[in-house]
A protein has these predicted regions:
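Regulatory extensions appended to serine/threonine kinase catalytic cores
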Residues: 1-15
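Eukaryotic alpha-helical solenoid repeat scaffolds
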Residues: 1-3, 130, 136-252
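Start-of-helix register in tetratricopeptide repeats
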Residues: 10, 44, 78, 112-113, ...
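"A position-specific structural signal for the A-helix of alpha-solenoid helical repeats
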Residues: 14, 48, 82, 117, ...
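Structural motif corresponding to the intra-repeat A-B loop/turn of tetratricopeptide repeats
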Residues: 22, 56, 90, 125, ...
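Structural marker of alpha-solenoid helical repeat scaffolds
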Residues: 38, 72, 106-107, 140-141, ...
Length: 252
C-alpha cells in the first residue's frame, strides 16, 4: 500500500484499515486526515476514526464519530448499530438499549447483532427477563442462533431458584447445543437446588414428577458425569466424593 501511486480515497482507506488491524493508530490518524483534507464530507474517514476510537477505548470519541456518520447517512443502520455499541461500552446503557431496539425492529439483517447487544445491556442492568426476550429475537436461521440458545440456557440456570424456574432451565439445557461438560455442570447445579426444594409430594421437573430419591439419583449421575469429563484431578476427586455421599448404601 505504501508503494501505491497517488492517494486515492480507496488507497487511503485501505491504509487506514491496515493500520487499524495492526494497532498503528498514528498511521490511521494520518490516513483519516488526508481523506478529510481531500474531502471534508468523506464519511468513510469519520467511520474509520470511529473504529479507531473503539479500538483505543475512547468511547466518547467513537460516539461522536458514529453519530456524525449517521447524520450524513440517516437511512443506514450500520452507524446506528456502531453508535449503540459505543454507548454500551461507554456506560450509556439507556441510549444503547434504545438504539439496539431500533436496529432489531427495522431490518432483519441487523436483528441478531442488535439482539445480542440488547441482551448484554439488559443483563448488565439486572433485567434477566428482558435479556431472555432479546435473545429470543434471534432467528433460527441465523448463524448466531446456537449461541443465543447457549446464552439463554446460561441465564436460566443462573436465575433458577424455584421449581418452575429449575424445570425451565433443565429443558433449556436439553434444547441448547451445549458441550457435555457444560450440561453436566448445569445439571449438577439444578439438581442440587431441586434436592433442597423437593418435599414428600415430589417435584415437577421438565415434564416429570420426581421423588426425593429420584432427584438424588439424578444429582449423583450429574456428579459422576462431570467427574468423568473434567481434566482437573482435584475437582474430579471432590465430585466423586459428593456422588458417594448421596448414594443409597445397603448392607448385604
Amino acid at each position: 500500500l505504501e508503494q501505491a501511486p497517488g492517494r486515492s480515497p480507496g488507497v487511503l482507506l485501505a491504509k487506514g484499515l491496515a493500520a487499524l488491524e495492526f494497532d498503528q493508530h498514528s498511521r490511521l490518524a494520518d490516513a483519516v486526515q488526508q481523506l478529510l483534507d481531500d474531502d471534508p464530507w468523506e464519511w468513510r474517514a469519520v467511520w474509520l476514526a470511529g473504529l479507531d476510537a473503539l479500538a483505543r477505548q475512547d468511547y466518547p470519541a467513537a460516539q461522536s464519530s458514529f453519530n456524525a456518520v449517521y447524520g450524513q447517512l440517516p437511512g443506514e443502520l450500520a452507524p446506528k448499530l456502531a453508535l449503540a455499541l459505543a454507548c454500551e461500552l461507554g456506560g450509556e446503557t439507556g441510549l444503547a438499549e434504545s438504539l439496539y431496539q431500533v436496529c432489531a425492529s427495522t431490518d432483519a439483517a441487523y436483528v441478531t447483532p442488535a439482539a445480542f447487544g440488547l441482551a448484554r445491556v439488559r443483563t448488565t442492568g439486572g433485567d434477566v427477563p428482558g435479556s431472555l426476550a432479546a435473545l429470543a429475537l434471534v432467528p433460527t436461521t441465523s448463524r448466531g442462533y446456537p449461541e443465543s440458545q447457549r446464552a439463554i440456557a446460561a441465564q436460566l440456570v443462573a436465575a433458577a431458584q424455584d421449581e418452575p424456574a429449575i424445570s425451565r432451565a433443565l429443558t433449556a439445557i436439553t434444547d441448547a447445543r451445549l458441550e457435555p461438560v457444560v450440561v453436566a455442570e448445569y445439571s449438577q447445579q439444578l439438581y442440587e437446588r431441586a434436592a433442597r426444594l423437593v418435599g414428600p409430594q415430589g417435584i415437577q421437573l421438565a415434564g416429570e414428577r420426581l421423588t426425593a430419591g429420584q432427584v438424588r439419583d439424578r444429582l449423583e449421575a450429574a456428579y459422576r458425569r462431570r467427574a468423568s469429563l473434567t481434566p482437573d484431578d482435584a475437582l474430579r476427586a471432590r465430585l466423586v466424593d459428593a456422588a458417594n455421599a448421596i448414594r443409597p448404601w445397603s448392607l448385604l
